[in-house]
Amino acid sequence: MSIRIASHAGFCFGVQRAVDRLEKALEGARGTNRKVYTLGRIIHNSHYIEHVKSLGAEEISRGDIPEIIKRADEGDEITVVIRAHGELKEISDSLYSCAERNPAFTLIDGTCPYVRKVRDIARENSGDGRIFLLLGNAAHPEVEGIMSCAEGEKYVFPDEKSLENAKISLNSANFCAKTLSVAAQTTQNLAEWKKSINFIKKVYTNALIFDTICNVTQMRQEECSALAKESDVMIVIGCRDSSNSMKLYDIARTSCKRTYFIEGIEDCPKIDVTDLKVSITAGASTPYSLIQEVYKTMNEQNENFAELLESSLKTLNTGDIVEGVITSISPNEIHVDLGTKTT
């Protein structure tokens, strides 16, 4: 058995940047009256969420913001951390405004620089005479934040098929009379993006195309695809709420039928991987410590299988009478499986 860990598995730059800032804020607040809040889950990983909760982080929702700002204006020392996905423009604006006027309130904007770039594109390429299209999951926090930065006519599409269904609209006088700009959620499937762009170019030749899938996502997906083609078993670690993790799972199982999606070591498949090639990859919100735990667990399971096999084999002594199973017969010999260490 061989187990490989993908070189691009685990925290990406944007996630690492956000969690580093959160942990620094928690360290600074230790022993003080300052409260540290994350606006939503800082990352899509339940193991890490429990870790930062133990350090004092508390999770709030958008609906809590008015009360948080009110408390800060009354003198409470408060820090709010925006996650790597970014936040709705109106929410961010109100938090920045509070931070500017109130020294007791600290805002840590952990929005990933790649996500910020897409938000800028949405703002600069929307409004009068323009239509903004975004490839992504409309319910994803990153997409919600990006679309809140776009003015006027704007649409989210999940895949090329949805564009085909909207072909009549794309060919309409309304679309043709306006400048069409197209971007993507930073963690989108690269293959789906290429198909979508090719389709748009066929029906709308003057579209402005912005390639906004982050390069780490591209490398992670390409490596996952290559490993899946070479592996007997693929393990994808992540959270089912994580867009990039689920896309890795979809990519892996295209080429490797024995692909398992797990969130932690408790989900590790109990399978015999003796003589098999196993590869492990993980989403951008997966701590490397968890990847190492899964690697260790898979190795230990394989050792246990080997020990069980060894203990199940009998040792024969001269004069023993045993039962066996004939496995093959040829003109010159008969093969019998005696369930022993030697034949």
Predicted regions and their residues:
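Single-stranded RNA-binding regions, centering on S1/OB-family and related RNA-binding modules
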Residues: 300-343
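The feature marks the mature, well-folded catalytic cores of soluble enzymes
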Residues: 1-299
